[in-house]
């Protein structure tokens, strides 16, 4: 079976490295970009199955980048990685087409679940983001 292809977007190189280690070898990580504008360009060119992106990035934030990609017909599933626990961010990410909303503090336990859910068109939200433990 072919591995799902993932593109990462985060402006913190050490976090990109950790995310890559978590996702491989189960998934093929195509690479990483550090801002939303670069994400839009790379996603159009590479056509990944899943985008794992930070909410807060320079030039174009993750939410705006996701909206732009969806408006352009991008079919990649979107999983947001974030430090934001504010429900307004969660709602904005879901409205932008996100299927995953993962707390960076729970990345090790939640990210693979979120990607799997996204690939099967299901929503995954880190339990801490919904007030659960």
Predicted regions and their residues:
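Acidic catalytic/metal-coordinating carboxylates
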Residues: 35-38, 61-64
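Two-component/phosphorelay signaling modules centered on CheY-like receiver
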Residues: 13-31
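Active-site residues of response regulator receiver
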Residues: 54, 82
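Conserved sequence signature across two-component system core domains
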Residues: 9-10, 33, 51
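Active-site beta3 strand of CheY-like receiver
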Residues: 46-52
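Receiver (REC) domain active-site loop signature in two-component systems and cognate sites
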Residues: 57
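Conserved phosphotransfer cores of two-component systems
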Residues: 44-46, 68-75, 96
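Short, flexible helix-to-coil linker/hinge segments that flank and couple to helix-turn-helix
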Residues: 90-95, 99-133
């Amino acid at each position: 079976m072919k591995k799902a292809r993932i593109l990462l977007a985060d402006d913190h190189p050490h976090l990109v490295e950790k995310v890559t280690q978590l996702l491989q070898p189960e998934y093929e990580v195509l690479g990483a970009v550090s801002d939303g504008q670069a994400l839009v360009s790379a996603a159009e060119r590479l056509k990944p199955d899943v985008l794992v992106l930070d909410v807060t990035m320079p030039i174009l934030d993750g939410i705006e980048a996701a909206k732009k990609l969806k408006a352009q017909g991008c079919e990649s599933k979107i999983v947001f990685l974030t430090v934001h626990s504010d429900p307004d961010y969660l709602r904005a990410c879901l409205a932008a087409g996100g299927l995953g909303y993962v707390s960076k503090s729970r990345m090790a336990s939640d990210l693979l679940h979120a990607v799997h859910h996204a690939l099967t068109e299901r929503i995954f939200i880190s339990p801490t983001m919904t007030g659960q433990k």
